[in-house]
Regions:
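Phosphate/diphosphate ligand-binding glycine-rich loop within oxidoreductases
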Residues: 66-150
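N-terminal glycine-/charge-rich "phosphate-binding" loop or analogous flexible N-terminal tail
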Residues: 1-67
């Protein structure tokens, strides 16, 4: 990865904590970057603008982080050890739901690691999905869609 694939705010402000987004899907780059000014003078942000599930790459990208925003990858116990016991990470913020599926919460709690969700992440998607389920139950749109597609 070259430097053009990294968006970093206030790199000279080493007095501020570093938040790292080690992986992200392309459609989320602009929405995330648009909110970076909210953290001006609060934290530095380093966002790697690609997606990988390679553990070594994720660990390399987060080696200086104090907080990590987790989107689409699991924090295994080995990764948790590397980032918290041998590293500097004290907080994981998850961009999604089902946090307990992505990290061992009792181990994180035992180590004093904060684990939280990104505020309002997926609010619209949850509401849209709820209405889709209502339409399926009320009008069986899935079955009818299948019939139309079959002719």
């Amino acid at each position: 990865m070259n430097e053009r694939n990294i968006i970093e705010t206030q790199p000279e402000r080493t007095d501020l904590p570093l938040i790292v987004i080690p992986v992200i899907v392309e459609s989320m780059i602009e929405p995330f970057a648009a909110n970076f000014p909210l953290l001006h003078d609060i934290a530095r942000i380093r966002m790697h603008c690609d997606f990988t599930l390679d553990t070594d790459t994720i660990l390399e990208r987060t080696k200086d982080a104090e907080a990590v925003i987790v989107i689409g990858f699991h924090i295994t116990d080995d990764i948790l050890d590397a980032m918290t016991v041998r590293g500097h990470v004290s907080c994981f913020a998850f961009g999604g739901t089902g946090v307990a599926s992505y990290i061992n919460l009792p181990v994180a709690r035992e180590r004093g690691i904060r684990v939280c969700n990104v505020v309002h992440y997926g609010d619209h998607a949850v509401a849209e999905h709820a209405f889709a389920l209502i339409m399926e139950l009320a009008r069986q749109v899935g079955r009818l869609d299948e019939q139309v597609r079959r002719g």
